[in-house]
């Protein structure tokens, strides 16, 4: 009851609201300090290029790859766990919660103009550890129509990391 009361107090402040421009865009530099962001870790540029390393996953190292148990924790698009879902026999990732495809690059998906392969022959990134890569907080820009290319070096993403969102309340 105490937690519910505290959540209600935050909602009644009228300061925060859900981000309306799409889940995937919420985790980009453009949406920093949006009305959904309650508490975040501020990314600060410095001459040493130090920062958080979420953008490194799109390069050769892929050191922050999501583990299989994280992938398997996504519920199905009907809002139920796989074993209770009408999509229980579904193979692949199409019937998972739509936030999955906006958060994770997975085998068979298209990213940076290429179909992600399971054999690690993609030129622009590898997925050697788990076969999956994070999209969230990854910085990229479209330099040519249909072609997305990273615009930052490793360990220097300028994107803040949201620790508490209004949706969490």
Predicted regions: what they are:
Residues 1-124:
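An aromatic- and glycine-enriched ligand-binding surface/loop that stacks and positions planar moieties
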Residues 88-166:
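Flexible, polar/acidic helix-loop-strand segments at domain edges
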């Amino acid at each position: 009851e105490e937690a519910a009361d505290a959540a209600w107090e935050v909602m009644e402040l009228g300061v925060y609201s859900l981000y309306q421009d799409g889940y995937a865009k919420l985790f980009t530099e453009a949406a920093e300090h949006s009305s959904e962001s309650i508490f975040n870790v501020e990314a600060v540029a410095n001459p040493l290029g130090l920062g958080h390393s979420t953008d490194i996953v799109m390069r050769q190292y892929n050191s922050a790859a999501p583990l299989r148990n994280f992938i398997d924790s996504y519920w199905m698009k009907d809002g139920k766990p796989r074993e209770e879902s009408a999509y229980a026999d579904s193979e692949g990732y199409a019937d998972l919660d739509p936030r999955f495809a906006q958060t994770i690059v997975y085998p068979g998906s298209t990213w940076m103009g290429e179909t992600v392969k399971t054999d690690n022959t993609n030129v622009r990134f590898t997925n050697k550890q788990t076969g999956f890569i994070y999209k969230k907080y990854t910085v990229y820009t479209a330099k040519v129509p249909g072609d997305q290319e990273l615009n930052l070096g490793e360990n220097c993403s300028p994107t803040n990391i949201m620790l508490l969102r209004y949706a969490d309340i």
